[in-house]
């Protein structure tokens, strides 16, 4: 019998590599399984590059399995060489703990805790931190061959550029994690990104050598690559964070709504819990009425709601609608700052509109500035102004601090007073 979960994962293209597919499928059909996915606290927030493996873990929870979320308070102090060409900078204990705390809070939004198959959050510092050097070398290191490690892509790719003994031992630490969780929480499956295959299989091999035959499986999700070949997960402003103080819900929503037609269906499969029927209907919409961008809107709505909440989604949609209509008065000062933080800014001293347009570099000359005004091309805070003698007044200064000028349909400028 085919597992409904695995059938869904395969349709979505979420299984990149897996160990013993038939045995794993039989296990998932037979019982509720504890499944784990981990991350190292390299920052105090996850970013969207972390989403795919954790959302895949969430799909296991939706099908009755128990997710175990590991935050690497110990491994985060060492540094994973996977996917790296250089050595990581070691973090202080205080910085790692700060990052662990930040990511732990985000997990509460991503998973259901306290239910019958509620998620369990663990920190590998709780067990790795208790292993002394001699125990590590005798009880674990004895079971790991150096040649075995040298054949791992994460290590082999670093041999020419150099790798420290610290990072060389990383895969052993993650292998210990899998064995510990298997023994203490009956974890039988580990999920990770495609770069984690070597670490996952190392855990299975260590368990086999230490305990004999153990029921343990591994699965990786694909590396997310955009249709233009560029790396997924970054906007022009850098990483897209799950922390709303680093990336606002509006910016987060905008990242997803700007997904090109060539990627949107794949992303709907990867990053939403919509059914096959809904996604098929949206695919038809992309083919027949792409100008409506229904698929992009649904993608942005679903991911924003999942990562943040309904109220954050509502605010993001309201800002988007207000900007589209040019109704800036519908937005608060904070919303305007967020919306226009990337537009050109200019500090001006004059209050005369014509002089302001020149001083701020909005219009190239007095003649052009006057033409722009009389032709209705200039708006102040969303209101069209066609008086060439217009003077900026106190009510034009939002919180007595800034004014938003628009020239034409899409060119915005922030004037600082």
Swiss-Prot record:
Signal peptide: none annotated. It is found in: Cytoplasm. Keywords: Aminoacyl-tRNA synthetase, ATP-binding, Cytoplasm, Ligase, Nucleotide-binding, Protein biosynthesis, RNA-binding. Coiled coil: none annotated. A motif ('KMSKS' region) lies at residues 231-235. Catalyzes the attachment of tyrosine to tRNA(Tyr) in a two-step reaction: tyrosine is first activated by ATP to form Tyr-AMP and then transferred to the acceptor end of tRNA(Tyr). A motif ('HIGH' region) lies at residues 41-50. One of its GO terms (molecular function) is RNA binding. It comes from the Bacteria. Homodimer. L-tyrosine binds at residues 36, 170, 174. Its EC number is 6.1.1.1. The keyword Aminoacyl-tRNA synthetase applies. ATP binds at residue 234. The gene is tyrS. Belongs to the class-I aminoacyl-tRNA synthetase family. TyrS type 1 subfamily. This is Tyrosine--tRNA ligase. Residues 351-417 form the S4 RNA-binding domain. GO terms for cellular component: cytosol. It catalyses: tRNA(Tyr) + L-tyrosine + ATP = L-tyrosyl-tRNA(Tyr) + AMP + diphosphate + H(+). HAMAP family: Tyr_tRNA_synth_type1. CDD domains: S4, Tyr_Trp_RS_core.
């Amino acid at each position: 019998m085919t597992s409904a979960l695995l059938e869904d994962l395969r349709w979505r293209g979420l299984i990149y590599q897996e160990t013993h597919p038939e045995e794993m499928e039989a296990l998932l059909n037979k019982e509720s399984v504890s499944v784990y996915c981990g991350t190292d606290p390299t920052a105090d927030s996850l970013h969207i590059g972390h989403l795919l493996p954790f959302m895949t873990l969430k799909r296991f929870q939706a099908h009755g399995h128990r997710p175990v979320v590991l935050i690497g308070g110990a491994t985060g102090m060492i540094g994973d060489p996977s996917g790296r060409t250089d050595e990581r900078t070691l973090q202080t204990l205080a910085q790692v703990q700060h990052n662990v705390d930040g990511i732990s809070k985000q997990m509460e939004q991503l998973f259901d805790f306290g239910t019958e198959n509620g998620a369990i959050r663990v920190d590998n510092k709780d067990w790795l931190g208790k292993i002394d050097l001699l125990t590590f070398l005798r009880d674990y290191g004895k079971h790991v061959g150096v040649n075995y490690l040298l054949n791992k892509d994460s290590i082999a790719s670093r041999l020419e550029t150099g790798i420290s003994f610290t990072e060389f031992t990383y895969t052993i630490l993650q292998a210990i994690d899998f064995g510990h969780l298997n023994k203490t929480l009956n974890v039988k499956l580990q999920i990770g990104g495609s770069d984690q295959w070597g670490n996952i299989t190392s855990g299975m091999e260590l368990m086999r050598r230490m305990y004999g035959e153990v029921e343990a499986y591994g699965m990786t999700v694909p590396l997310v690559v955009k249709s233009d070949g560029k790396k997924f997960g970054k906007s022009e402003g850098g990483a897209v964070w799950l922390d709303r103080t680093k990336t606002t819900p509006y910016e987060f929503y905008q990242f997803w709504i700007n997904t090109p037609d060539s990627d949107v269906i794949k992303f709907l499969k990867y990053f939403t819990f919509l059914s096959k029927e809904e996604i098929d209907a949206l695919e038809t919409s992309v083919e027949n009425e792409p100008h409506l961008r229904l698929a992009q809107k649904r993608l942005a709505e679903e991911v924003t709601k999942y990562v943040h909440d309904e109220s954050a989604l509502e605010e993001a949609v309201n800002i988007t609608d207000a900007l589209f209509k040019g109704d800036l008065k519908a937005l608060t000062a904070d919303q305007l700052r967020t919306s226009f933080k990337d537009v050109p800014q200019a500090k001006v001293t004059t209050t005369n509109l014509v002089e302001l347009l020149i001083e701020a570099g909005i219009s190239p000359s007095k003649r052009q500035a006057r033409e722009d005004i009389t032709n209705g091309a200039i708006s102040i805070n969303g209101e069209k102004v066609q008086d060439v003698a217009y003077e900026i007044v106190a009510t034009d200064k939002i919180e007595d601090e800034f004014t938003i000028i628009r020239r034409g349909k899409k060119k915005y400028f922030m004037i600082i007073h």
